[in-house]
Amino acid sequence: LLDRKAPFRTQMDFDNAGFLVGCGDQQVTRVLVALDITPEVIREAAEKGCQLILAHHPVIWGKVGQITDETATGRKVLALIEQGIAAICAHTNLDAAEGGVNTALALRLGLRDQVPLAVDGTDEAGRPYGVGRVGQLEGGPMTVDHFARRAKETLGLSGIRVLDAGVPVQRVAVGGGACGSMLPQVRAMGCDTFLTADLKHDLYLEAREAGIDRKS
């Protein structure tokens, strides 16, 4: 079901999304959804009688040469197995999916006529997919401060860092997670504003020089 909504084949090369822990024939009646699979999340899943954790960030990441109690990853994988809990992680495939992370962010912010920020391929229906979204702000342009307040309130953010390049907000790029490296695509798409979670200082300077309002 998840693979139909956000195909794992669309994940980025560095990613490790997919069915990472468990048995394929395991019966599932209760699912815990989480951003990360931590020891606390595993305990909560066990206490609530869940057979599956669906997480955004992969519980197994990078090169893993062993699964033992001597590493953080090993301890979590062993705990999942001991509790009989499977793990499926949908990361960049969910970021890129139609209706996924970035689509949801863009809709919450009031962006219409959405297109991918960077096209990585096409789905079975021939529609382009890719990480990030670009759209026009409904209701016309607004000030950077106004848009920053909207983003903070709408997305429930505890804080937001703003670079005001002195241009109104109208065509907005959204990149959930660390998407600061996509600034060239933002410029190529003619965006005046970029909302992302990346905080690298050099990219703020580059955005200012390019005349792009940046929020993170």
Predicted segments, located by residue:
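Hydrophobic structural segments
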Residues: 1-215
